[in-house]
Amino acid sequence: AGGGALFDIGSHILDLLYSLLGPYAAVQATLDTLIRQRPAAAGSPELQAVDVDDIALLHLRTAGGVLGSVEVSRMGTGLTNDLQFEIFGEQGALRFNAVEPGWLEVYDVREAGSPLGGMRGFRKVQAVGRYPGQKAPDASMAPDFVRAHAECQYQFLRAVVEGRPAKPDLADGLHIQAVMEAAERSSAGGGWVQVEEDEHA
């Protein structure tokens, strides 16, 4: 039946982290199906076997040597369309939660640590979209999934009109596809698996 939670949900967080941290080099993954049967249709008493993952746990290494982990699940009781990430570095950290898309939490180690704790700590920074050449939607509009999709379409059409390559492009999509396929191989065979780009060339 193809991919489950990894392909459906994981592709988005993998793409987002790719744009922030660069290409992936290797992955170690566990994919599992916790609910083995589901109704054939909403309200149907007939059950059908589930043959795709509903949870995926990935350890990743980027080409630049960054290590990280990604958890993707259809099993998050009480969650809606949550997407969160945390990135920790030597000089600071970032936290983002798509439930509050207008804010990015930033920690800067250069902030004074004294007296009495100083100014250290995570700060919320406004993360409204102010993009070069932006016409609509206006930056004053609350960020959400619809606005993000509209901005993607606008930037693509703008690239076409200006005669330049659009980003992300097909190669970026193929890279994420290669990462997910490497995750499937890792889950099936165990251990770390290199991301093989040439299989889609």
Predicted regions and their residues:
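Residues at helix-coil transition
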Residues: G22, R158-E162, A188
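A general structural signal for well-ordered alpha-helical segments in protein cores
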Residues: I13-L14, Q153-Y154, M180
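Hydrophobic, well-ordered secondary-structure elements that form the walls
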Residues: F156, G173, G190
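C-terminal glycine/acidic-rich active-site capping loop/insertion
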Residues: R36-L57, R61-T62, F85-E86, Q91-P168, ...
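C-terminal hydrophobic helical "lid"/dimerization subdomain
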Residues: G173-S187
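C-terminal capping/lid region of NAD(P)-dependent oxidoreductase domains
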Residues: R185-A201
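Rossmann-like dinucleotide-binding domain that binds NAD(P)(H)
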Residues: A1-T80, A171
